[in-house]
Structure formats: C-alpha cells, structure tokens
Design a protein with these regions (language model features):
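The feature marks proteins involved in alpha-glucan
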Residues: 1-80
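Substrate-binding/active-site clefts of carbohydrate-active enzymes
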Residues: 63-64, 69-80, 86-204
Length: 204
C-alpha cells in the first residue's frame, strides 16, 4: 500500500500532493532499486505494482524466527573489542549470509562485538548507508529480516554482541518524513528537509 498525502497549506517549496510509503514500514518495495537486488540475497522479492512509481509498503508475513539465544549478556562498555563492518564491502557477496558464513573468521579475531554500519533502507544500493530513507526497514540488497536475525543469533551463540549503527538525521529525497515537509524549489519531488520539518534538521 501507499499513502497519498494532500496539504491545504504546504510549507514553502514543498509539493501539495505526494505519494509515499508508510514511514514505519518494515519492508519497502521500490521502483528505483529492486531490479538490482540479487535473487540469492532476497528470494521471492515481492513484485512492484505495474504502472506505478516510487515506493510501497509491503505487509511482510514472513515466518517467525525461533531464537536459539533468548538472553544475552552484553559486554561492559569498557571491555568492548569492536569490529566494524560495511556489509556491502566486507566480501564479494555483500550479504548477511556472507557474514554468517564467516563466523569462524570473526571468532579468530578474539572480538566480542560487531558493529554493522547502517543496514536500514537507504537511497540506492551502493552506499555506506548513512542516507537512510526508512529507518525501520532493512535494505533488501543485504538480505531478509530473518537472515539478519540468524546472523545476530549466531554471534550471540559465540559470545559476540551486534551493534547497529544508526544515522537518524542524514535524510533527503525519498524519506516520506522529508517529503511531507520538503524544501523542493524545483518542484520535482526531490530535496532536503525544510526549516518547518518537525523531524529533521536542515543541516546534519
């Protein structure tokens, strides 16, 4: 589904009518990026609606994940030994499955935490991830929700915490919370937050 938002008094430089996916989506299908997502990373990717553009919320009815580790004692801050990973560049597969396959490598490093650079839905597929568009939706290029959970579960089984790097204010263009209060002087549905945006600062 998709929302069509009308504004009787739009902020200056912002469109009067926009179509956006749900800002709180946990799965986004996109006319911009989905044709570049490998089948082995996200099997059975929902098909984008014909004759539509933009992004839609897809209600995800994926199977429940059964955690092996339901309680995990995280390391104290002063004891953390963190290994930071950009999933895209860690290995050629660029996927959560790739991280799962390398668990022995992580164990041999004698680390106790892995920090994932942003894995939330971001603008495009080739990015460091610090330009999030949907903060509660995983970027499908890396894999499914359950595959990320499997990786976290496996790390916990081996005494490794997983930290998610969040970039909350680095947003523009495709974020619905930007589009509803957007600085769009060219009237092309593209821009950054306006000075009236209640969620984001104009300068990060």
């Amino acid at each position: 589904y998709q929302y069509q938002v009308f504004s009787k008094s739009p902020v200056s430089g912002s469109p009067t009518v926009i179509k956006v996916a749900d800002p709180f989506s946990n799965l986004i299908i996109s006319s911009y990026d989905d044709n570049q997502i490998p089948e082995n990373s996200f099997p059975n990717l929902p098909k984008f609606p014909e004759n539509q553009i933009g992004e839609f919320t897809f209600i995800n009815k994926s199977e429940k994940y059964d955690w092996n580790i339901t309680e995990f004692d995280k390391p104290k801050k002063e004891d953390l030994i963190i290994y930071e990973i950009l999933v895209r560049d860690f290995d050629k597969e660029s996927s959560f499955q790739n991280l799962i396959d390398r668990i022995e490598y992580f164990k041999n490093l004698n680390i106790n935490a892995i920090e994932l650079m942003p894995v939330m839905e971001f603008e495009g597929n080739e990015s460091w991830g610090y330009n999030s568009s949907y903060h509660l939706s995983l970027d499908k290029f890396y894999g499914t929700q359950n595959k990320l959970k499997e990786f976290i579960d496996l790390c916990h089984q081996n005494g490794i915490a997983v930290i998610l790097d969040l970039a909350l204010n680095h947003v523009f263009g495709r974020s619905p919370l930007v589009k509803m209060w957007m600085d769009d002087p060219d009237n092309n549905s593209w821009g950054g937050p306006s000075n009236e945006n209640p969620y984001f600062n104009q300068s990060a």
